[in-house]
Amino acid sequence: MCARWKNAADTGSQSSQGKVPKRGDESRQRRRTLPEALLYPDGPAKDRTRDKENGKMSQKLRVGILGATGMVGQRFISLLENHPWFEVVTVAASPRSAGKTYEEAVGGRWKMDTPMPEAVKKIVVMNVNEVEKVASTVDFVFSAVDMSKDEIKAIEEEYAKTETPVVSNNSAHRWTPDVPMVVPEINPEHFDVIKYQQKRLGTTRGFIAVKPNCSIQSYAPVLTAWKEFEPYEVVATTYQAISGAGKTFKDWPEMEHNIIPYIGGEEEKSEKEPLRLWGKIEDGVIVPATEPVITCQCLRVPVLNGHTAAVFVKFRKKPTKEQLIEALRNFKGLPQELELPSAPKHFIQYLEEDNRPQVSEDVNYENGMGVSIGRLREDKVYDYKFVGLSHNTVRGAAGGAVLCAETLKAKGYITKK
């Protein structure tokens, strides 16, 4: 995944017929076509700096990763390599890792399928608890810390109060009423609650924004695409990969040839978090929607990456199958309109084959940022049923958080200090 931004910072000196990877071409084109006010929300003079080596204009924001040595932290490191807008300059972790280089701190626990980026290997790990020290080095942070929920809530607020925006992968603040929980294609307007949060925190720049649970990525976007048909009752069963627990088969050999029919806390998250995505801002807080009613079972299955969901839906305005497929294929959100660097060109793909989506074939659709849907058909008890698949550590974790940060930058909430 780290190679996705290869050459993204190059200028257009090479033609489109040169040997520049296609993704790099798209990233550069996106940077050129974004409105100046979105690329540089504080104005060109403040937000653009000159690359001393080649004289080119660049405007990378300095990023810190909290919890950088864990699986999600590693995914952040991997995804942000050569990112056109963001540069990892600080990595922070527990006191036992502090003082070591990132390479030493991770040791043999690098779990990505691509090599550790050279740019981060020699960065000295900072103590995540030294909030002021860490915050002084960055423009904003991604949070993937492994602590108790109360500890996470406290430390993320500490960072926000240093006027450092926090984009969190953690669940601790997902139900804090004035903290936006966002899938940028679904509810980017919820970022507007930040101004109320800042009043509570006493900040002008610092805030917390979070992304939702990985389990809902395979069906919440689909139900959003079908909103006009008024889905009101949903039954879902999720089949969740072991990387969602921060594990590989090497770490968790007992998961081979095994299924565990329980994942602590996942069913409640899977039932309630979509309703918050579909909620509205009222009196400075986010009020969740009340429909559709969702009931869910979550199973851990012997797959490394990729959460699959089998979903049944009832509609108040029952559509045809063709209408549902058309809605999926036409669905896009703000990231697609702005052509943000991490945004999939086509958020949802519908697959006609009876044996799709498959993890082995489809989990990396749109670099892991897209959602794959198949087996849509009428049901004898519900109106329709389908199968969804998403990448749990990309779209469902670090990648989703990176897209949130890109959206926040485009909307002017994240700027250089």
Language-model segments: which ranges?
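Sequence/structural signature of beta-propeller domains
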Residues: C2-D51
